[in-house]
Curated annotation (Swiss-Prot):
Protein name: tRNA (adenine(58)-N(1))-methyltransferase non-catalytic subunit trm6
GO molecular-function terms, A-Z: RNA binding
Basic and acidic residues compositional bias, start-end: 466-479
Cellular component terms per the entry's GO annotation: nucleus; tRNA (m1A) methyltransferase complex
Length: 572
């Protein structure tokens, strides 16, 4: 993540009302913040994050310098007011013990404020002090201000600051901020009401981490290599969270990209000089990472990953300098289950010699290179996905989990974690039942019975001794009727949930805040991929301790001789 604001970058603006607005900073444009005013985007481009600005209205000018950086001392003074606990509110009592000054007799209605709404609106138009003049006028015209305690006065002042101060704080857009932004807005269903706590559980149980920069051949011995299989229907939020953990979410600095491209051009220099195809594909290859990659399975022609645009990656027009350009791969369900039914995978473009290509026009030659490179990319990604050996499976979909795991779990390597997210617990309880121990035992027992019956039939028919005929495999179609999926492929299925709630802690009134958001809880199913053994394994239980036996039972010792230090021989 960059430490300063860059052009064409999405940033989050924290307003005084504690609301967050995400905007894209386009140079030479104006950013509008509603009632808080507007400012030119060029005034904050190039500045560091986490600065608080005040919008100063400058009439008669081009508003080139209409922002003021709020110093930390001023911010800290306001924070002390907001977090104060009423220091200096020691209530004086009279001789009878009755408080002299409280808020009980104060009636907070519109009559205490002498300024009308029309006067406040007129003052907004002529005010140039970022709202401070309006706050001062409101405090002066309040008739019951002297009756307030110090703490109630601080709360009143803070409430007016949130309403009239024209301030904003620039924050970088990360996964946690975007999750809360989508959850608190009106688009929570687009992300399946995924919360920050659930994202943490997904990354933890999925063992999502950076897979290293080594090549695929060099990293085979040091598994895992960071290849993850993902089904994401949250608009790309799960993919963004995984990419953040893997270090491939945020674009790198241009200096690092130039150095990387220079090194790549030196390594491929000879190949570019000898092959015309390599010259056309000299630019950065799309979906070419062999490790530390995310393979997204989608049901449509293109995956729905619209939320990745907040991190500088547009699925329709991807930037070659972005890490996701190489490290994120997309495969459709048709390409995964029946690749020859896909027109792009099945129809290979004709290979045209370089001599013939030299006679083509530039636009025709470019179209041929694009078509050929697209077929090679689809072929490579699909074959790699069907080969399997992934290091983890992350599922966040509204489809039936059993139908998804039936085709994706066999693609995982041994000890690979499986994580399934669902807003409700019912689909996950059914999934946990399908992988439960009783079902696994029944599946293995039934499978052994089928194998035993098949062996008996072969021995009776004499096929086992016939070398000319190939032995037939047992028919496991009956297992598919009784079991929706193979329960012996996953071990230790578990369902978990986690949710952070803000509580009101007061004597006798401790409960969750009534203003807290409801919605789905969000549940996580996780298990471990295992390979079932093809041998009959029987548990023998814990062996009992060996019993000591005297070697020569004929020479039994008397009670007096038993403590004479005679060695006792152990027999196994």
């Amino acid at each position: 993540m960059h430490s300063y604001i860059r052009p064409y970058q999405h940033v989050a603006l924290r307003l005084p009302s504690e609301l967050t607005k995400i905007v894209r900073l386009v140079p030479n444009t104006v950013v509008y913040l509603g009632k808080y005013g507007s400012f030119p985007a060029n005034t904050i481009i190039g500045r560091p994050f986490y600065l608080t600005f005040e919008i100063i209205d400058v009439s008669g000018e081009n508003n080139d310098n209409c922002l003021r950086i709020v110093p930390p001392a001023e911010l800290h003074a306001e924070t002390l007011i907001a977090d104060g606990e009423g220091e200096g509110d020691d209530v004086e009592v009279n001789e009878e013990g009755i408080p002299i000054r409280t808020n009980r007799e104060i009636v907070d209605d519109a009559s205490t404020q002498k300024m009308t709404a029309e006067e406040i609106e007129a003052l907004k138009k002529v005010s140039t002090g970022a709202g401070r003049e309006i706050i001062e006028k409101l405090l002066e015209s309040h008739s019951a201000l002297d009756q307030k305690t110090a703490f109630s006065l601080a709360k009143y002042t803070l409430r007016k600051r949130k309403k009239f101060l024209k301030r904003f704080t620039v924050l970088p857009v990360d996964v946690s901020l975007l999750t809360n932004y989508m959850l608190e807005g009106k688009e929570a269903m687009k992300t399946m009401e995924l919360r920050d706590e659930s994202i943490g559980l997904i990354g933890c149980w999925g063992n999502v981490h950076h897979g290293g920069q080594s090549s695929f051949e060099g990293a085979v011995a040091s598994k895992p290599n960071g290849r993850y299989l993902v089904i994401d229907e949250t608009g790309g939020l799960v993919v963004a969270a995984m990419a953040e953990r893997m270090g491939i979410l945020y674009p790198h600095d241009q200096e690092d990209e130039d150095q990387e491209l220079a090194e790549g051009s030196e390594e491929n220099g000879e190949r570019q000089q000898t092959n015309a195809m390599a010259q056309a594909l000299a630019r950065r290859r799309h979906m070419a990472a062999s490790g530390n990659s995310i393979t997204v399975i989608h049901a449509n022609k293109q995956p729905s990953l619209s939320l990745l645009r907040y991190f500088g990656y547009d699925q329709d027009n991807p930037d070659e300098s972005h890490p996701l350009y190489k490290h994120m791969k997309t495969v459709s369900w048709m390409q995964l289950l029946d690749p020859h039914a896909d027109t792009i995978y099945a129809n290979e473009p004709e290979v045209i010699p370089d001599e013939t290509l030299a006679t083509f026009k530039s636009n025709r030659r470019s179209a041929y290179y694009k078509k050929r490179s697209r077929w090679e990319r689809v072929r490579r990604v699909v074959d790699e996905a069907r080969a399997g050996n992934f290091d983890g499976l992350i599922v966040a979909t509204l489809m039936e989990p059993a139908s998804v795991l039936k085709h994706t779990v066999p693609l995982l390597a041994g000890s690979a974690p499986v994580v399934v997210y669902s807003p409700t617990v019912e689909p996950l309880t059914e999934l946990a039942d399908l992988y439960s121990t009783p079902r696994r035992t029944a599946y293995i027992t039934r499978k052994r019975e089928i194998i035993a019956q098949h062996s008996l039939q072969q021995s009776l028919q004499g096929q086992s001794q016939d070398n000319e005929k190939k032995p037939q495999e047992p028919d496991f179609s009956e297992l598919d009727k009784d079991f929706a999926l193979d329960p012996s492929l996953l071990l230790a299925p578990t369902i978990e949930t986690s949710r952070v709630r803000a509580w009101q802690v007061l004597p006798g009134r401790t409960h969750p805040l009534m203003s807290g958001r409801g919605g789905a809880e969000g549940y996580i199913f996780h298990a471990i991929r295992v390979f079932p053994s093809h041998q009959n394994i029987q548990a023998a239980g814990n062996p009992s301790r060996k019993k000591r036996k005297v070697a020569a039972q004929q020479e039994s010792a008397t009670p007096a001789e038993s403590g004479s230090g005679v060695d006792v021989e152990m027999q196994s």
